[in-house]
């Protein structure tokens, strides 16, 4: 298992402990990828997982570029359309740094 996969598993477990329900993982399209798809009450939650062993380069949260946010949004829109879902959604980030988990709800 790669470090990225380990981080995603850790994030998934953490979010489940917080009351979210797992739906799908690593949804890939030619134009973007979604790390985790979860449900929280009536919202579908598209989660980007960022891992850094140290924050010497600005940390995990700062590693998310505008271009990457655009690709995640496009992938989420495509997912909702292909699954015929007309539901409220949000975009969260789970940042894992130095064995600490930071959950940013509605991050972008």
From Swiss-Prot:
Tree of life domain: Bacteria
SUPFAM superfamilies in alphabetical order: Restriction endonuclease-like
Cystine connections: none
CDD domains, A to Z: PoNe_Nuclease
Family statement drawn from the similarity comment of this UniProt entry: Belongs to the UPF0102 family.
PANTHER family: UPF0102 PROTEIN YRAN
HAMAP family, sorted: UPF0102
Name the UniProt record assigns to this protein: UPF0102 protein Shewmr4_3685
Source species: Shewanella sp. (strain MR-4)
Taxonomic lineage: Bacteria, Pseudomonadati, Pseudomonadota, Gammaproteobacteria, Alteromonadales
């Amino acid at each position: 298992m790669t470090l990225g996969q380990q981080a995603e598993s850790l994030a998934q477990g953490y979010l489940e402990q917080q009351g979210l329900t797992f739906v799908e993982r690593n949804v890939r399209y030619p134009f973007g990828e979604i790390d985790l798809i979860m449900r929280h009450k009536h919202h579908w939650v598209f989660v980007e997982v960022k891992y850094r062993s140290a924050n010497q380069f600005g940390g995990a949260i700062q590693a998310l570029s505008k271009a990457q946010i655009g690709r995640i949004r496009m992938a989420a829109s495509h997912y909702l359309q292909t699954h015929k879902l007309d539901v409220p959604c949000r975009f969260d980030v789970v940042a894992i740094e130095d064995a600490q988990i930071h959950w940013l709800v509605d991050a972008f």
